[in-house]
Amino acid sequence: MSFWTSTIICVLLFQTVEPQPVRIDKDWNINQAYVDVFKILSTQNTCSDFYGGPRRATTVLNSFVIRVKTQSLLREVSFQMEGSVTIFHDPTTGAVYRLFEKTAVNIHGSFYQRRADPMRKFPSDVGNFAPGSRAARALILLHELGHLIQGEDGTWLLPDDGNDDRRSSANTIRVQSVCRAQLEKLK
């Protein structure tokens, strides 16, 4: 076999390898949300397309989810990423993405807490989904993933929320709109 032939075979094999779920040592809620999101992103659909396709999306998800820690934050906050940022370029997928030094999910927020009394404001819904539901947890992870992946135009798929509740809500609605069909199946 010539060098040229072996190179082509290696490239083709390398490109067809699908990312596999990583084993994470997290609590049940994070594990379930991760598995749900991995399943959503591992097939070709409008949701995975938003994140650059199944290979790119699941590669970044795997790098991201292992960093997630639980923390007590203000109840209005579901998730927080802060600290120094590291930029990654994955040559096999072409993904350019960033990971933050600190990545925390709020134990008192909408990821974990359900609203016992429908008349209460907190924990708040996540998009159109009830707090603490499978769909809400998956939407939270998908929202955060959108802040990490750089689009073809060089900007992040979702602009940083900062402390802007309106921008955060708009980002959540944007993700929900492209992932609605997949999220609805989690109810």
Feature locations, PLM:
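Walker B catalytic acidic pair
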Residues: E144
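Predominantly extracellular/secreted Zn2+-dependent metalloproteases
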Residues: C10-A138, L148-K187
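Sec-dependent signal peptide recognition
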Residues: M1-I9
